[in-house]
Amino acid sequence: SRLISGNFSELEDLEEFFAKKLEAPSALYYNSGYMANIGVLPVITDRSTTIICDELIHASLRDGIRLSKAKHVVFSHNNISKLEELLLKIEGKKLIVIESVYSMDGDSPDIEEVFNLAEKFGAGVMVDEAHGTGLTGENNLGQAQQFINHPNCVAIVYPLGKSAGLSGAFVVGSKMLKQYLINFSRSFIYTTGPSKQLVIQLRKQLETMMKKDTSFIFALKSQFLNSLSSHYQYITGPYGAVVGLITADKTQNIESALMDDNLFVKAILSPTVQRGMERIRICFHDFNTKNEIDSLLSILNSRV
C-alpha cells in the first residue's frame, strides 16, 4: 500500500505533472479506472446525498454508487431537461455523475449546461473522462478540463487504459478531495501501489499522448461515415472515436465476417446494450489506415 511502503517520489511527481497540465489543484493515482470510480463515490457522498446519473454511465460508476450510502436516481441519456426536472424536485445534497464521451454510443453530454444546472441547483458534478482522454481539448485531455476549477466540480476521473495505453487512473480535484481519498478511499488504501517501472513508462506515454495530432483519427471517422451505406443506423458524437453501428440480429454474423478479414471489430450484445440496439462497436485509432477503412466499408456495405 502507498500508505505503508508503496509510495515513492516518481509517483508523486507524476501526479503533480498531471495536475499541472490541467491547471488543477491535485491529482491522485489509482490502479485502474474501475478502482477510481468505486473508490471515489463512497467518499464524496453519504446517506443525505442523492446521486443523479445518466442512464448510460459505466458499470464501474454504477458499482461505486452501490458501494456508497447515497440514494440515486437516473435521467434519460443526455437529456438536460430531465436532469433539470430531477434537480428541481430533489432536496438536500446532490451529485451529478456523467461521462464526457459514452463508451457504447460515442456521444457526449452538454457539459457546460450540466455545470450551469449544477450551479443553479447547488449540486456537485463528477465526470468520467475514460473515452475523451487523448482525443480532444488542450493537451488532448478531454472536454471536461475547462471545468476542473469550477466551484461545483467535485472530481474528474482520467483512466489511462485507453489512449495512454497502459493502466491506472487519475482522480483530479481539490487538495481537500485528495486528502479525503488518501485517508478514506478503500480501493486506494487497501491495494498494492504501482511499480516504479510502470510509473516511469506512464510519464513517457502521457507526454507522447499530450503532443499527438489526433486529427487523423477524426479524418478516418469522417471517411467511414461519409461512405457508409445510408441503410445503416449509427450513433456517435463529435468528441469520441467510437461509432455504434446498429445491426440487431445480424451483429454476430457481421463480426465474424470482419474478423475473417483481420479487422478487429467487436459485437456488443444485450444485456450490455438494450435489446434491439445490438451493434458493431467501431473504434478508430491513429494506427489504422485508410485501406483498413476501405476494407471495413466494403464488408459492411455488401451486407446491407
Language model features with spans:
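PLP-dependent enzyme catalytic core of the Aspartate aminotransferase-like
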Residues: 10, 16, 20, 272-304
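Conserved PLP-binding catalytic core of the aspartate aminotransferase-like
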Residues: 216-225, 229-262, 272, 284-286
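Active-site phosphate-binding strand-loop segment of PLP-dependent enzymes
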Residues: 73, 77-127
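Active-site PLP attachment segment
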Residues: 147-180
